Amino acid sequence: AMRALGATLVEHGDDFQAALGHAQVLAAAGGLHAMPSFAPELVLGVAVSALAFLREAPPLDTVFVPIGLGSGICAMLAARAALGLRTRIVGVVSAAAPAYARSLAAGHPVSVPATTRLADGLACSTPHPTALAAIAAGVERIVEVTDEEVAAAMRAFFHDTHNVAEGAAAAGLAAV
């Protein structure tokens, strides 16, 4: 679809971090601006959706938020704080890409291989330090889900709601 719209699509590496590193090299070589996957502007934009979700939902005890590089969960943490809510936020990572879970336990960024094949939006091998600090300050805990659990959640979404969810989007349901 991206090529059909005229984009040049470059695929590189085995995980998100490898692709990101290559994109940064290409941007620098071409004099292009590369929007980082974790940036304050991006977190603010995502927080608009998180604010709308938390305002429109009935009072929630807990929200399960998938963690890729961290912008989504940081946005949810910011929205919760802005609204003064007590909602617990639980981060969800792939058991095959547990960098944020390992880093939270260690108290500092820990790099681990990201080998998930189903939830590629969770395929983070090295946490962003700013995201990790925000997560550590506000998350209830981080849980790990297997690709099999994600696949079951994807099937449940399709069977129960007639919607197709990609792996990272189904991770929150897989964690419940």
Language-model features, listed with the residues they occupy:
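PLP-dependent amino-acid enzyme catalytic core
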Residues: 1-176
